[in-house]
Amino acid sequence: MNEFWQHCSALLERELTPQQYVTWIKPLAPVAFDADANTLSIAAPNRFKLDWVKSQFSGRITDLARDFWHSPVDVQFVLDPKAGMRTAPAAPSRPPSAGVRNAAAAVDAAVGAVQAAHSARGGGMPGLGMPTNAAQLTDDAADLDLPSLDANEAAAARRTWRPGAAAQAAGGESDSTYERSKLNPVLTFDNFVTGKANQLARAAAIQVADNPGISYNPLFLYGGVGLGKTHLIHAIGNQLLMDKPGARIRYIHAEQYVSDVVKAYQRKAFDDFKRYYHSLDLLLIDDIQFFSGKSRTQEEFFYAFEALVANKAQVIITSDTYPKEISGIDDRLISRFDSGLTVAIEPPELEMRVAILMRKAQSEGVNLNEDVAFFVAKHLRSNVRELEGALRKILAYSKFHGREITIELTKEALKDLLTVQNRQISVENIQKTVADFYSIKVADMYSKKRPANIARPRQIAMYLAKELTQKSLPEIGELFGGRDHTTVLHAVRKIADERGKDAQLNHELHVLEQTLKG
């Protein structure tokens, strides 16, 4: 029995991602084998893992048992009798949980992927003509938000990093440095939870923090609301301030930048505006889609971008969508965005959502039971902000009612949210959406046809069904014309693997996911 489990675990470790293996397979243990009845019992540490392993991995483990003993084996999954007495330990602030550590270890490999992707794009920027005439501006803006900077400071700031900068910014300068930069010192790489969904973006961010103005300029991060784009760019700024305390850094939301342009125009203060923004070492601009339709803002940002890149200063931009799909942005700016590295941040996978909840609970001084974390993560899938909001509701509900945090209490605290979430994306809707996207018939999803123009969309639909629904592999296979669960597993792994290597496929999947989520 133990020999089989060592063999089975080794095979599954090769087949699964590190996070999946550590989260689901490693905690299992064989507890009994009845040779007469050919029955193998495997124990799981808690009810959630028991149910999940039964639905997702029982078929594969049963196949491996049959191959090992050369006869059919009835694999039964049972709850560890000690499970009821266990509580999940508080997640350490550093290092992160095992699943997250394994994903973070993949960052080094992701750095190589980032470099390869960038090299494949080729260098150089196309030449641009002068910007078009500015549109008329309104005056509904906030005060011009520029820290003071005299001519001598501006001249001194036009250099790249200098060795003596750290000494000049030591001691009491720290608070004023953060005030000028608008950075949030809490948002660092250390407390950024890493998983498959964001490891490439994190790898690129670390490269930029280590080599500002050299590695990827600009760095463009895009993805939906609440996925960690703002956290990452603050982490870059904070890391750079640690390494180069004298660096001139500015984080600004695109709406505030628009307001600054408006006020500079009203006050005829564009010289001050340009002197400040053109002299930065690092400009972090969040949600650039808010530049849409604002011609004068785009013109001024174009000038700032050109000046910063020419001075080997780093520019980092975020958006909710792929650069070429942002409406109302001048093509010349789009070409500039595209000249650097563009990386997507996807919604977090299950293991990553659990790690986020455990980490957040630990930071609040709460020892969150693992079953509760898995329950919340299983039902809330869209983004980190939603997870954190749900956790706050649970903590408040527990405090107000003076009750321990259990799954039952969690259901009560989140009943309104869970009601909304239960209106789930259906496999049928996924099939129709993917069929429309790739111009094939919905019937092709169930057919046995294998031409590439049909098989590929079908595999993509299977992948999305696994990612966006709670259906098991056998259930998904049944909805795709009665296919075996191993066929679905192959499709899921194939698309997941290619997604990390193929930018076009990743973009198509991003569009499909956003469409399905409404």
Swiss-Prot record:
SUPFAM superfamilies: P-loop containing nucleoside triphosphate hydrolases, TrpR-like. Belongs to the DnaA family. The lineage of its organism: Bacteria, Pseudomonadati, Pseudomonadota, Betaproteobacteria, Burkholderiales. One of its GO terms (molecular function) is ATP binding. It is found in: Cytoplasm. Domain I is involved in oligomerization and binding regulators, domain II is flexibile and of varying length in different bacteria, domain III forms the AAA+ region, while domain IV binds dsDNA. Oligomerizes as a right-handed, spiral filament on DNA at oriC. InterPro entries: AAA+_ATPase, Chromosome_initiator_DnaA, Chromosome_initiator_DnaA-like, Chromosome_initiator_DnaA_CS, DnaA_C, DnaA_dom, DnaA_N_dom, DnaA_N_sf. It comes from the Bacteria. Residues 155-178 are annotated as: Disordered. This is Chromosomal replication initiator protein DnaA. It comes from Paraburkholderia phymatum (strain DSM 17167 / CIP 108236 / LMG 21445 / STM815). Residues 399-518 are annotated as: Domain IV, binds dsDNA. The keyword Transport does not apply.
